[in-house]
């Protein structure tokens, strides 16, 4: 089972990701468990309490704490999680790779770009398990 968490404060993006991930899971018959967070502080609290994920989808621009800062903190607990940043701005692309981002996906999120990215990161997770 691949464990994925996503964190985005925008309710519309939150709903869109939920629908896309469900469609992906159904179409690809993916063994994927998804957990949603609206705040990076809640995600960090879960990780600090022992939750582990294989894939994280993080919004970059959030009010409580930005996704890049959250990723730096997450890396203190988990060096191997595949982090994909989601944002409407290219401004933080270089900085995202400093924290070991797997990918930097620009919003809006479209199925034709999201599904191949998910295929790639799911394959990377399978390779990491071997």
Indicate residue ranges for each PLM-predicted region.
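Acidic, metal-coordinating helix/loop segments flanking the phosphotransfer/catalytic sites
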Residues: 36-55
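The feature encodes the CheY-like receiver
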Residues: 62-63
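C-terminal output helix
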Residues: 109-120
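Short amphipathic alpha-helix used as the core "switch/output" element in two-component signaling
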Residues: 68-79
């Amino acid at each position: 089972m691949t464990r994925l968490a996503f964190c985005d404060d925008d309710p519309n993006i939150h709903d869109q990701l939920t629908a896309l991930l469900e469609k992906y899971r159904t179409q690809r018959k993916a063994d994927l468990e998804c957990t949603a967070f609206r705040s990076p502080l809640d995600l960090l609290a879960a990780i600090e309490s022992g939750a582990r994920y294989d894939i994280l989808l993080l919004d970059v621009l959030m009010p409580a704490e930005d996704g890049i800062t959250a990723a730096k903190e997450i890396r203190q607990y988990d060096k191997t999680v595949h982090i994909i940043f989601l944002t409407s701005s290219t401004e933080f692309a270089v900085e995202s790779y400093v924290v070991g981002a797997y990918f930097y996906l620009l919003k809006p999120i479209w199925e034709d770009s999201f599904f191949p990215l998910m295929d790639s990161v799911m394959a990377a997770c399978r390779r990491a398990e071997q």
